[in-house]
A protein has these predicted regions:
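Loop-to-helix entry region of an early transmembrane alpha helix in multi-pass inner-membrane enzymes
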Residues: 70, 74-77, 86-105
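Transmembrane-helix motifs of polytopic, lipid-linked glycan transferases
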Residues: 4-7, 94-119
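Extracytoplasmic catalytic/substrate-binding loops of multi-pass membrane glycan-assembly enzymes
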Residues: 33-47, 53-79, 90, 235-240
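Multi-pass, polyprenyl lipid-linked donor-dependent membrane glycosyltransferases
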Residues: 95-102, 118-155
Length: 270
């Protein structure tokens, strides 16, 4: 990727094509790799395959295979299932390439924010060096990271120019996608909004009057959670941690586990 971007930097005259070329490069990498990791194969692609077979966005809400986190959002699996429908068959390679196209909006935001081809190339090399295979191996974590950074950039621009309707619309769209990638997206968005308000107390009233519109991405998240609640689809990790019968006792057991605290103390001692 470093050599590819270096070649682009010195050979491409039209700078607007650079984000698209990065997508093309990552697309080739995605096509050349098979989903073998658990989360990619047994959660995200499994959900997409069920949508492909059942012809329904709600296929996972029958709570079959509870270990596959059936409460997870369906936006990216839906796109993978749509790609499979486009070619007319399912395999473990082509559908996951749809995730790569999801990276284009953050890249365009990064490029417009940096306003310099060399800086964009430098940023892309650093970002993809850190994220590595998480971008194209079927995981959602790399994509979630890119959308978190791009949403942070848009919110920063919104803080500087809260009256710009284009930036506000883009912030809403970014936020809706952020909460629809993984469950963590909702908490990330909440942290970003709270941080925006805390770091701009002098503009608190002006920003707060505009931020009410950010209820839209929370509605996206809430609607999906209501569907999960209606079909009695729970998060197995949350259920195991908090429990249904006696959550206080389960939390006490976790904090009373001496071996965990002993392991932590050994780490600090070493």
């Amino acid at each position: 990727l470093i050599y590819f971007l270096y070649f682009c930097l010195n050979s491409i005259k039209r700078k607007q094509t650079l984000p698209a070329l990065i997508i093309f490069y990552l697309l080739l990498l995605s096509i050349g790799t098979v989903a073998i990791k658990w989360d990619a194969r047994s959660i995200w692609l499994f959900h997409a395959k069920r949508m492909f077979i059942d012809n329904s966005i709600f296929a996972q809400l029958d709570n079959y295979a509870i270990w596959s986190h059936n409460d997870y959002p369906v936006m990216l699996p839906l796109l993978s299932a749509s790609f499979a429908k486009l070619v007319g068959f399912w395999n473990e390679i082509f559908p996951k390439t749809s995730n790569i196209f999801f990276i284009l909006p953050p890249l365009l935001i990064f490029y417009s924010y940096l306003k310099s081809k060399p800086w964009f190339v430098f940023f892309s090399i650093g970002a993809f060096f850190i994220l590595a295979k998480l971008v194209f191996n079927g995981y959602m974590d790399g994509i979630l990271t890119l959308y978190t950074i791009s949403t942070l950039i848009i919110l920063h621009q919104f803080r500087s120019n809260p009256k710009n309707k284009t930036i506000l619309l883009l912030a809403i769209l970014q936020s809706c996608i952020l909460v629809s990638i993984k469950n963590e997206g909702m908490f990330i968005l909440t942290i970003l909004i709270i941080s925006l308000l805390i770091t701009n107390l002098s503009q608190f009233k002006a920003l707060f009057k505009k931020l009410w519109i950010f209820v839209i991405p929370y509605l996206f998240w809430l609607i999906w959670k209501l569907f999960c609640q209606y079909f009695q689809v729970d998060n197995d990790i949350e259920k195991g941690l908090l429990g249904v019968d006696d959550p206080i006792n389960n939390i006490y057991i976790i904090f009373n586990d001496r071996s965990s605290f002993q392991s932590i103390s050994l780490i600090f001692k070493n």
